[in-house]
């Protein structure tokens, strides 16, 4: 989803399949499984094409020192996408499901071909939908990697076999970088109404209002072994969680406040020593982000402890040193959630140098949301995550 409407943190991205369903709640409509697909991130696509990100310039690819008071999302590293249908008959779009933002948007057929990103993506054509209703209110969404703008429209959206009437953004202006290389078309915000631009009711709120779910929760599973493009990248469950993908019971942490998927954190340990956040800090849980991020000062201290070297936008170690790096533990709700080096180090197979990138970034988020850590797919792959709207809390269980 930055930032943090997450890090567009993102991700992170899901594949939603299903037919339209209406009616009163039943056993078949209270629990919806949604398959996820994994893709190369925009950053990976750039590197695979031999693009030197340093040459793009910090003004084009800035990922740090965000001055906005809202959470911004950086979709450079988003890896998971899903599908939704918009209109009648449904027009299908690949989207990021992002707990760091609250609006739904897709590219519009009214987007000028002068915007290269629109040429490479599926466009929503209102004239092809019999259920479309005009709104026209202007919409602008700022992300750390650029601004998208357009206007609001209303139509039916089908997600996970559930169909709701939804106000969403038709984007008519979107920057070539990073969106030209993105495999996803748009974004579905899974955040709260307090974050929604234009006072739009978020999609999940509309689903809740239909009374079709057993519980007012949704959960995320990201497959740690999904490098094969044909394998299941992960899963979202609307209305519950899937015991096939986690072990034991959930451990819940209450949100800092209603309106943001942010929880208190009591420390970050490297090995057996608590190195950071000794006096307490905050952590966003961001499905739109692929990496874990913290403030620049915190990440610099962490990287020094790991012996990692900084590149323009990331940190690297020699690959043969990766297995020897210490565990990193996050202290949440009285428990320690530990990542081994195998969880936060990955090798760039397309790099000629034997360097491995750490799935940890620096990100400075200003008040009132920040300073804050953000726990993205690096964390969620290890810990199955349940977002409980009914009780304003987040639950974690060991993924399997």
From Swiss-Prot:
SS bond partners: 111-118, 277-281, 319-356
Presence of the UniProt keyword Translocase in the record: no
Positions glycosylated per UniProt: 65, 135
Active site positions: 98, 286
Reactions listed under catalytic activity: Cleavage of Leu-|-Xaa bond in angiotensinogen to generate angiotensin I
Main location: secreted
Enzyme nomenclature, EC number: 3.4.23.15
Modes of activity regulation: Interaction with ATP6AP2 results in a 5-fold increased efficiency in angiotensinogen processing.
Biological processes per GO annotation: angiotensin maturation; cell maturation; drinking behavior; hormone-mediated signaling pathway; male gonad development; mesonephros development; regulation of MAPK cascade; renin-angiotensin regulation of aldosterone production
GO CC terms of this entry: apical part of cell; extracellular space; membrane
Known partners and oligomeric status: Interacts with ATP6AP2.
Cited function: Renin is a highly specific endopeptidase, whose only known function is to generate angiotensin I from angiotensinogen in the plasma, initiating a cascade of reactions that produce an elevation of blood pressure and increased sodium retention by the kidney.
Family: Belongs to the peptidase A1 family.
Name this polypeptide is given: Renin
Organism: Callithrix jacchus (White-tufted-ear marmoset)
């Amino acid at each position: 989803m930055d930032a943090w409407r997450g890090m567009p943190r993102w991700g992170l991205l899901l594949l939603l399949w299903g037919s339209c369903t209406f009616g009163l709640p039943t056993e078949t409509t209270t629990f919806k499984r949604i398959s996820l697909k994994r893709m190369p991130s925009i950053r990976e696509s750039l590197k695979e094409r031999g693009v030197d990100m340093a040459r793009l310039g910090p003004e084009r690819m800035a990922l740090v020192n965000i001055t906005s008071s809202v959470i911004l999302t950086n979709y450079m590293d988003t890896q998971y996408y899903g599908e939704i249908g918009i209109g009648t008959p449904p027009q299908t779009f690949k989207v990021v499901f992002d707990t760091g933002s609250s609006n739904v948007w897709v590219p519009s057929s009214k987007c000028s071909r002068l915007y290269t990103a629109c040429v490479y993506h599926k466009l929503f054509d209102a004239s092809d939908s019999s259920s479309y209703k005009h709104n026209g209110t202007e919409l602008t969404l700022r992300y750390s990697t650029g601004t998208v703008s357009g206007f609001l429209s209303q139509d039916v959206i089908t997600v996970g076999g559930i169909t709701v009437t939804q106000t969403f953004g038709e984007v008519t202006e979107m920057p070539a970088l990073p969106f030209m290389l993105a495999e996803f078309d748009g974004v579905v915000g899974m955040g709260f109404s307090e974050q929604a631009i234009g006072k739009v009711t978020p999609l999940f709120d509309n689903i809740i209002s239909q009374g079709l779910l057993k519980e007012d929760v949704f959960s995320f599973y990201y497959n740690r072994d999904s490098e094969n493009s044909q394998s299941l990248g992960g899963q979202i469950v609307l209305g519950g969680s899937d015991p096939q993908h986690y072990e034991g019971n959930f451990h819940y942490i209450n949100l800092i406040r209603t309106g943001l998927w942010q929880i208190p954190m009591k420390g970050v340990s490297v090995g057996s020593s608590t190195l950071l956040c000794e006096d307490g800090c905050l952590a966003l849980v961001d499905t739109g982000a692929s990496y874990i991020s913290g403030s620049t000062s915190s990440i610099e201290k962490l990287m020094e402890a790991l012996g990692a070297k900084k590149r323009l936008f990331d940190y690297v170690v020699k690959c043969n040193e990766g297995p020897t790096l210490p565990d990193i533990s996050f202290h949440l709700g009285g428990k320690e959630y530990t990542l081994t080096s195998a969880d936060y180090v990955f090798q760039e197979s397309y790099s000629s140098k034997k360097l491995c990138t750490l799935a940890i970034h620096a990100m400075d988020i200003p008040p009132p949301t920040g300073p804050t850590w953000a726990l993205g797919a690096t964390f969620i792959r290890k810990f199955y995550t349940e977002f409980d709207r009914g009780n304003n809390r987040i639950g974690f269980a060991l993924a399997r």
